[in-house]
Amino acid sequence: MVDLRYGSGNIFNEKVHGIGIIALGSFLENHGSALPIDTDAKIASYIALNVSIITGAKFLGVVLPSTEYSYVKHGIHDSIKDVINYIKYLVENGRKIGINKFLIINCHGGNTLIKDEISKLNHENCFIRMENVCLTHAATDEVSLGYAVGILSEDKMKTHDPEIYEEIGMVGLKEAREKNEAIDLEARSVEENGVFLDRTHGRFLLNELINNYVEIVRNMI
């Protein structure tokens, strides 16, 4: 049996090896012209990996399936069961390498639908916590955060307009606005204020999110 040096490297302490970080987003969603279709997955992965590097917790990767409200039609999604089964796979294999606490960083609003199912996975020897970053779809916050992460095309901001791409702020998603008051309020805000890139805000938001999850990991130890 190899004697592993759990105290080596830049880590909070040896106990952090019992914590795993999972990124959750979506891979197949339109985000206007300036952001890629896998924006949510990339932002979640960027944040999760950086939190792992800073704390020493183990980055377990990104969940491939994603789910969505049936009335939000801006991409290709999967069932809640598909998402949960993938998370179960990561958790089961994480436990084989000594992880008993899991932090899921979710950057896709539709995935909040799995909340109740996630709670069912918790038991005495396995704790799972999901934190959500839910920004107005492809609007100012997400554009600015995308810039900070490095996935925004500034040249394509010229055509990043909800009058051209209906999913921006979900302004043109009529059914979603009719069935979800929160979506309608966000869409109204985009209609009134527009969408623009704020580089300073994007960098601030990214640092704030990373620091927030670093503290969550610290408290999970």
Swiss-Prot record:
<dbReference type="InterPro" id="IPR003785">
    <property type="entry name" value="Creatininase/forma_Hydrolase"/>
</dbReference>
<dbReference type="GO" id="GO:0008198">
    <property type="term" value="F:ferrous iron binding"/>
</dbReference>
<feature type="binding site">
    <location>
        <position position="40"/>
    </location>
    <ligand>
        <name>Fe cation 1</name>
    </ligand>
</feature>
<dbReference type="InterPro" id="IPR024901">
    <property type="entry name" value="FAPy_deformylase"/>
</dbReference>
<keyword id="KW-0408">Iron</keyword>
<keyword id="KW-0479">Metal-binding</keyword>
<feature type="binding site">
    <location>
        <position position="108"/>
    </location>
    <ligand>
        <name>Fe cation 1</name>
    </ligand>
</feature>
<dbReference type="GO" id="GO:0043729">
    <property type="term" value="F:2-amino-5-formylamino-6-(5-phosphoribosylamino)pyrimidin-4(3H)-one formate-lyase activity"/>
</dbReference>
<keyword id="KW-0378">Hydrolase</keyword>
<protein>
    <recommendedName>
        <fullName>2-amino-5-formylamino-6-ribosylaminopyrimidin-4(3H)-one 5'-monophosphate deformylase</fullName>
        <ecNumber>3.5.1.102</ecNumber>
    </recommendedName>
</protein>
<dbReference type="GO" id="GO:0052645">
    <property type="term" value="P:F420-0 metabolic process"/>
</dbReference>
<comment type="pathway">
    <text>Cofactor biosynthesis; coenzyme F420 biosynthesis.</text>
</comment>
<feature type="binding site">
    <location>
        <position position="29"/>
    </location>
    <ligand>
        <name>Fe cation 1</name>
    </ligand>
</feature>
<comment type="function">
    <text>Catalyzes the hydrolysis of the formamide of 2-amino-5-formylamino-6-ribosylamino-4(3H)-pyrimidinone 5'-monophosphate (FAPy) to form 2,5-diamino-6-ribosylamino-4(3H)-pyrimidinone 5'-phosphate (APy).</text>
</comment>
<comment type="similarity">
    <text>Belongs to the creatininase superfamily. FAPy deformylase family.</text>
</comment>
<dbReference type="GO" id="GO:0009231">
    <property type="term" value="P:riboflavin biosynthetic process"/>
</dbReference>
<feature type="binding site">
    <location>
        <position position="31"/>
    </location>
    <ligand>
        <name>Fe cation 2</name>
    </ligand>
</feature>
<comment type="subunit">
    <text>Homodimer.</text>
</comment>
<dbReference type="Pfam" id="PF02633">
    <property type="entry name" value="Creatininase"/>
</dbReference>
<dbReference type="InterPro" id="IPR024087">
    <property type="entry name" value="Creatininase-like_sf"/>
</dbReference>
<comment type="pathway">
    <text>Cofactor biosynthesis; riboflavin biosynthesis.</text>
</comment>
<feature type="binding site">
    <location>
        <position position="40"/>
    </location>
    <ligand>
        <name>Fe cation 2</name>
    </ligand>
</feature>
<keyword id="KW-0862">Zinc</keyword>
